[in-house]
Amino acid sequence: MSTTTLTRREQRAKAQHFIDTLEGTAFPNSKRIYVTGSQHDIRVPMREIQLSPTLIGGSKDNPQFEENEAVPVYDTSGPYGDPEVAINVQQGLAKLRQPWIDARNDSEELDDRSSAYTRERLADDGLDDLRFTGLLTPKRAKAGKRVTQLHYARKGIVTPEMEFIAIRENMGRERIRSEVLRHQHPGMSFGARLPENITPEFVRDEVAAGRAIIPANINHPESEPMIIGRNFLVKVNANIGNSAVTSSIEEEVEKLVWSTRWGADTVMDLSTGRYIHETREWILRNSPVPIGTVPIYQALEKVNGIAEDLTWEAFRDTLLEQAEQGVDYFTIHAGVLLRYVPMTAKRLTGIVSRGGSIMAKWCLSHHKENFLFEHFREICEICAAYDVSLSLGDGLRPGSIQDANDEAQFSELHTLGELTKIAWEYDVQVMIEGPGHVPMHMIQRNMTEELESCHEAPFYTLGPLTTDIAPGYDHFTSGIGAAMIGWFGCAMLCYVTPKEHLGLPNKEDVKQGLITYKIAAHAADLAKGHPGAQIRDNAMSKARFEFRWEDQFNLALDPFTARAYHDETLPQESGKVAHFCSMCGPKFCSMKISQEVRDYAAAQTIEVGMADMSENFRAKGGEIYLKREEA
């Protein structure tokens, strides 16, 4: 762990340099490929890992090799993963989805911003130096129209976004011919429906049923379509955002790009400090993945941090502000009801959700019902006009394993199920947020309760952390729970970094959290039996057995760390072709010995076979030519 501490000025300067010098970059021995669709000019980006050939025989002077197929993998890095694309953070990313949105002809550009706060910020000349220069003119659904992917799915329409997703979810596995790589153990899916091939129609059907969501605000055309649902690959979210204590716009944009490089399927901007509006604009215009927020955080800033002073009007203005910037999903704590708050009184750790505690304080101070619950239909109307998905927040999630699975937690969950049905009346897409801190033996009940209470809407959980004794290592404690609940059916896992409970994560913390959660998500996909999930594992195992060190590094989730660990003890180039590593050395490597046993067994088989043929030859009289027997 690095002990170097940078000053705030140095941190900002470093982030600014990262942004100024940013260019599309591929992982080692990987290249960007695009898989085309049947319509809509769809080009789905993937990363293809090139592999070296296997030595199968021959001599030192004339070796014989067998080619190994390149392995395609899911890629969240967007244009940042393509060396052929010119990157300019000042201009933002290309608007991939704009032609699809325009072709539907059900939205229109606004003459002015709907949010009073946005109009106020735009009129402030003092913010010019902070403002993103290429502001979009926001769109909204035409009168009487709904522009959500759920609306289209229910109408039987397969959108370009759905076809894009179908290609992406198949991960290019149709390109793989090797039976060794295609081999896969049957999974245990706990009722998940996993087709051998994901089609656009299957995507449409899952969205129409509410079992999956496509977070895709019409004002975020830069995003590459992705899907969150139990019957698809398990996804991972990364949290970024400034606070009143630390971080800047430059650092948050850097963390966004860094997150997509290391596999974040979505990113939540949880900023609570200065310039929230301006920071979010920079993030959205440069994000190839969906962006989520917790609007109550910014609404609280607008009333100077005093929860009691929150109003529906201030919150509504915040929803409009963020929807017209392009936020793809809102976390809304509408299930924290007044009558549930006393249920938390006997908890060891009370209410640990920021949003949940804000709304609980408001309810108690006014002795009124949660205004998010009271105005939920109006929230849905706003979301339907921009296609903002709802992530129904678990404001009463347990903050310690002692409080897991209690009355408050499940009471709120049941209310979230009721709100889900209301949102669906407006064709608004919904996912459900979950805990939290839950010991391993109590995790599965959370998934079962969510499926039953929330009508199979996608589940999105923070971990859960399986023990409370490891500050500094909570990416491990939560990664265990994340892998388990992903296997049981959770659709998206919110990462936890090593800084959880300790401080705001930096760039390296973001990477550590994401790698941990990509492992958890992939382990869950393997356990569920997601088609094609084992291809990369098989390729890695084959490379490992054949001592193809470069391929092992390049197939890893983190090639740089894998290479660095190997080179700590065997830095020479000869170490990259050696048939051993520093753990066992040349005489005790199990795989080298296994290869020798295999070669010996093959030789013995040949020798025994020759002996059998010799005996057969003698038994028939030792004649070179035998007479053909008469029929």
From Swiss-Prot:
GO terms for biological process: thiamine biosynthetic process; thiamine diphosphate biosynthetic process. InterPro entries: ThiC, ThiC-associated_dom, ThiC/Bza_core_dom, ThiC/BzaA/B. Keywords: 4Fe-4S, Iron, Iron-sulfur, Lyase, Metal-binding, S-adenosyl-L-methionine, Thiamine biosynthesis, Zinc. It catalyses: 5-amino-1-(5-phospho-beta-D-ribosyl)imidazole + S-adenosyl-L-methionine = 4-amino-2-methyl-5-(phosphooxymethyl)pyrimidine + CO + 5'-deoxyadenosine + formate + L-methionine + 3 H(+). Pathway: Cofactor biosynthesis; thiamine diphosphate biosynthesis. Coiled coil: none annotated. Substrate binds at residues 239, 268, 297, 333, 353-355, 394-397, 433, 460. It comes from the Bacteria. Homodimer. HAMAP family: ThiC. Catalyzes the synthesis of the hydroxymethylpyrimidine phosphate (HMP-P) moiety of thiamine from aminoimidazole ribotide (AIR) in a radical S-adenosyl-L-methionine (SAM)-dependent reaction. Belongs to the ThiC family. This is Phosphomethylpyrimidine synthase. It comes from Salmonella heidelberg (strain SL476). The gene is thiC.
